[in-house]
Amino acid sequence: MSYFPWLTIIVLFPISAGSFIFFLPYKGNKVIRWYTIGICLLELLLITYAFCYFFQLDDPLIQLEEDYKWINFFDFHWRLGIDGLSIGPILLTGFITTLATLAAWPVTQDSRLFHFLMLAMYSGQIGLFSSRDLLLFFIMWELELIPVYLLLSMWGGKKRLYSATKFILYTAGGSIFLLMGVLGMGLYGSNEPILNFETSANQSYPMALEILFYFGFLIAYAVKLPIIPLHTWLPDTHGEAHYSTCMLLAGILLKMGAYGLIRINMELLPHAHSIFSPWLMIVGTVQIIYAASTSFGQRNLKKRIAYSSVSHMGFIIIGICSITDTGLNGAVLQIISHGFIGAALFFLAGTSYDRIRIVYLDEMGGIAIPMPKIFTMFSSFSMASLALPGMSGFVAELIVFFGIITSPKYLLMPKVLITFVMAIGIILTPIYSLSMLRQMFYGYKLFNVPNSYFVDSGPRELFISICILLPVIGIGIYPDFVLSLLGDKVEDILSNYFQR
């Protein structure tokens, strides 16, 4: 048991240390980069140290708990704590943000603000995953929006203002529903707001009210995850954002929606979840097929990868809605797995664009000969994305399959039908992945493009790719590494579920 405020330091350190960036020399790009990477590495070491020494894997209860009164007027507390569900996403956040900062090395325009915004996102993401208070959860959720909007609108492509505006309209619209759900749950049945997760978990609501709260939270998560039809901001955003921002979006931002769906909707509103889950299961199944089919029709490389992300999110939805130990484990494993694979694919797409200055697949071809290292890495991560055995994507999707097959909630025929449609989705994934590889790397197309230089991956880019590839293969070979972090938390969620 540690009484040292580890989580408060871990949450506040990136944004606090990041604010000193503005005191660094305006033209000292190298100093700014090393300073930011130093903060990210130190934060990752802090997270690893705190978790290794003070986190008990066999304890499903909240650990490293902190509770400080913040605003007396409406009994608002700074409540932090972690359990098996939040430890994986926090470690993923630390790892991907550090590599995204290294990936942002070529950014020289307003680099002080750029790196500060990345560190502000870092704090917001870790704050959200370790929050134990509904209002604090909402504040951390909102803390993400402004940095992402600015990163998009200032360092994006030609249509950056359009995609940034679309992003803020969608996510801010979803946040209104999130706030209504938070305030509704906090103020129900009491003169004083009850915002902490522990009390809310034991609170029972009238059925109609619980469905209303569930729906409010669901809309917010459906935008962030995204769930169709609220997904259209994602391809536009990924198509225009700088690839280091894409790494954070695909690696962490989308996972916040899935985390919220488990942490609040599943844990705090179980009756409504059992009503909504069959419908969400259908949506998740349709999403896998729809996004995989749409991805195949995309000319833009980054948009094709973005639609593949939407397709993979369908597996997370199905895992969460199976309401089984296996399915939920598979969903969390897919959250971690896709965090690595999605970030790597966007990074490689961005570095390829830096060299050839072409985004449309039908204009590419023959890149494998001048750039064999990029070709090798891109092929490896495409294989991971299409769930090649031995890679993390395969294990995650397989566990989700077992989860839906063994679910006692559904009858045999719906289970067979959903499994069959999911299998079609898995067949469609290699079609768009391998087609993307063929269009980019094979053939003998000559590039008549001014200012294009065919330089293969440098040491920095190779280092980032290998750093992401190692956990992808590691989890694929030994998934218990992630599943053991969950410990008894999944059983704990489901046991509360069936008791109530």
Swiss-Prot record:
What processes does the entry annotate via GO biological process terms? ATP synthesis coupled electron transport; electron transport coupled proton transport
Location(s) in or outside the cell: Plastid, Chloroplast thylakoid membrane
The membrane topology of this protein is: Multi-pass membrane protein
S-S bonds: none
Q: Which Enzyme Commission number(s) are on file for it?
A: 7.1.1.-
Q: What is the uppermost EC class here?
A: translocase
Which family is this protein grouped under? Belongs to the complex I subunit 4 family.
The name this protein carries in UniProt is NAD(P)H-quinone oxidoreductase chain 4, chloroplastic
